[in-house]
């Protein structure tokens, strides 16, 4: 029973230290711009991944990545379109 009480007290102390440490970090104004910059970078990277890259099949130009257009590749019958520069 004593071991359980000690373990509970240690857990409470550790949680208190963690909560105090997190609230102290939120007060630093320099950390927030980094956080927003990270989110913006992440959004840009996700947006970049959603486009179709060079050499991959496409149906319309807007789905291709920037500076690429959906062009016919190969035979004169034009059965395959791919994103090209």
Swiss-Prot record:
The keyword Ribosomal protein does not apply. InterPro entries: Conotoxin. Contains 4 disulfide bonds. Residues 24-49 form a propeptide. Residues 1-23 form the signal peptide. The modification Pyrrolidone carboxylic acid is found at residue 50. Pfam families: Conotoxin (PF02950). Its main location: secreted. This is Conotoxin Mi15b. The keyword Secreted applies. One of its GO terms (cellular component) is extracellular region. Keywords: Disulfide bond, Pyrrolidone carboxylic acid, Secreted, Signal, Toxin. It is found in: Secreted. The cysteine framework is XV (C-C-CC-C-C-C-C). It comes from the Eukaryota. One of its GO terms (molecular function) is ion channel inhibitor activity. Belongs to the conotoxin O2 superfamily. Expressed by the venom duct.
